[in-house]
Structure formats: structure tokens, C-alpha cells
């Protein structure tokens, strides 16, 4: 696999951690959110990586907890006129692309994603223009503007199948933005993949030596790894997959102890799926290294109860997602192409992001 344009050196400033709420404040905001959801004809859709109390509230109020694409599709099928998306900004954009007639609000428009930040549209356009013979495949974790430049949008659970399909047609691929997922897909498919060099700041921190030491402490444990992790970590896995695939693996694997290499937000739904199993976070530091994310996306952490209440209450420019209509139409083409491909394969598209 060819690899150029290394953006790995970028250090993204993390947002300030939300001020913790006490028990009374949490109860106050939960009730306020429930009231505002009814008043605004809104539904709360939360990503697997948000904090457990947010996921619980989404389920309690008739919303959903899912990956970014399923969040958008749930919103499309739900009768509510407003979607409150608890996640990061590209997830709100995806919801708006697929639901243009609905108002899409977010707790904050400043919730970024290192994969999105690491693939700016102008640089990516120039990169694609310099390789006009290649089919452009971008991960769901990208801006609407980058999606609009792509031939295909893809989620992690369908990535290998799609690249195998394109390879069978003799097509050469540009893959963006995650280099680890790109490497994984190339290794599984054998396709000619030219990979953009972005990375998820959470998954990029998982360490092989520290994981090996943890595995030695729990020799009977199964290791579950998201493919946005480094290849050496993926090679240690008993199961590799997207968020929904890892939850399914946790249910079906015979081991009662699981070491999980993805954002710890997934533990809420994973523990629901297998309450009899013991879950451990895979280590993100060791051998003299320190972690920055420490297995939890700092931008996902911005989706607190107070911020959700403010998003519903204030709406407007500080919270509403807007996507230019021409751009939306362009981004919708590769998204629909992926959905059609998945339906043909009779796959349920459940990605990460």
C-alpha cells in the first residue's frame, strides 16, 4: 500500500472538560431535557461513545444509541421534526444530509473529530486531483465537504466488502482519512490502496506492550479491537470490528473476561449486551508513554446534560446544523451509493465513528 501526505504530526487542542454536575443538578437537567424534547417535538440520538448517562437518557426518552449512520437513519424514520444529535459535528452533518427537512441540533458545534480535522477539504481535493485514475472512498468520519468529493462513503463494518468489490472491478483506491483502517482494509482485501494519513486520537493511543502485559494478567480474556487501532494492536485481537460488531462479538465470544480497545463509552451498551461478563479497557499508555485521550474522546465528552438542555433551549446559530443544499446533494450521492451496495449484499450498515 502506498502512503503519502502524513498529517500525523498535527496536535489538536483538546476542549476543556465539562464542569461536573452534582446529583441534584443531574436530576434537574434530566427532567428539563425530557420536557424540552416534548416541547420541541425532538428526539435524542446519541453515539456509542457519549457518556453512559447520555446514552441512558436517549433510551429512556425513546431515542436511540447507535453509530453515526444508524443515528441518522433512526432520525429519518422517527416522526419527530427535530433531531438532537449527541456526538461530534460530522454526525450532525450526516443526519442533516439524510434528513434535510428536519431541524438538526447539537449540544455544541465545537465537538470535533481528529479524523475530520485531519482531512481538510482543500488539501484533500488537491490530493485526489493528483490521482485522477483512482476511485475515492472516504470514511463516515469526514465533513460534508469531503464526502461531496468522494465516489463512495463507507462505514467500518462494510469497508472490507466494498474495497474487495471495487478491487474486483480493477479499480485503484484513494482511502481517507484513517490510515489504520485503510491499512486493515488493504491487508484484508489485497487491493491497491493509496492512503491518507489521518488517525483517531483515541484508537491511535492503544499500545501493544501494555496490552500484552494486560493479557498476561488475564490470560483467559478475549481481546476486542476496533480497526482504527494500529495494525500491531489489531494483530493481537480475538475479534476486530466496528462498534456494533464489537458489541455483537462481546455477546457471542465464550470468554467471560473481555479487554476492549475502543472508546470506553461503548461499555454502556456492551455491558447491557453481556451483563455476566467482565470488561476491561485496553491500555492507552505504557513503556514511558502517556495518554492524551485515555480511551475517551474529549469532544464526545462535551455532550453533557447541561449542554444538551442548552441545545434544545437555545437552538439557533450556536446549536443548529446547516449544510448548503448543493453540497448536501453532492454528499448524498456517495452515501446513497453505499446504502444501495449494502442492501444488495443484504448487510445491515452499522459503522463507527
From Swiss-Prot:
UniProt entry keywords in alphabetical sequence: 4Fe-4S, Cytoplasm, Iron, Iron-sulfur, Metal-binding, Pyridine nucleotide biosynthesis, Transferase
Gene3D superfamilies recorded: NadA-like (3.40.50.10800)
EC annotation from Swiss-Prot or TrEMBL: 2.5.1.72
Binding-site residues, iminosuccinate: 47, 68, 139-141, 156, 226-228, 243
Pathway: Cofactor biosynthesis; NAD(+) biosynthesis; quinolinate from iminoaspartate: step 1/1
Top-rank EC class of the record's enzyme: transferase
Superkingdom per UniProt: Bacteria
Catalytic activity: iminosuccinate + dihydroxyacetone phosphate = quinolinate + phosphate + 2 H2O + H(+)
InterPro entries xref list: NadA, NadA_sf, Quinolinate_synth_A_type1
Required cofactor names: [4Fe-4S] cluster
GO biological process: 'de novo' NAD biosynthetic process from L-aspartate
Comment on bound cofactor: Binds 1 [4Fe-4S] cluster per subunit.
GO molecular function: 4 iron, 4 sulfur cluster binding; metal ion binding; quinolinate synthetase A activity
Predominant localisation class: cytoplasm
Record localization: Cytoplasm
Residues reported in the UniProt entry to bind [4Fe-4S] cluster: 113, 200, 297
GO CC term, one of those recorded: cytosol
Family membership noted in the UniProt record: Belongs to the quinolinate synthase family. Type 1 subfamily.
PANTHER family according to UniProt: QUINOLINATE SYNTHASE, CHLOROPLASTIC (PTHR30573:SF0), QUINOLINATE SYNTHETASE A (PTHR30573)
Function: Catalyzes the condensation of iminoaspartate with dihydroxyacetone phosphate to form quinolinate.
NCBIfam families, A to Z: nadA, PRK09375.1-1, PRK09375.1-2
The name this protein goes by in its record: Quinolinate synthase
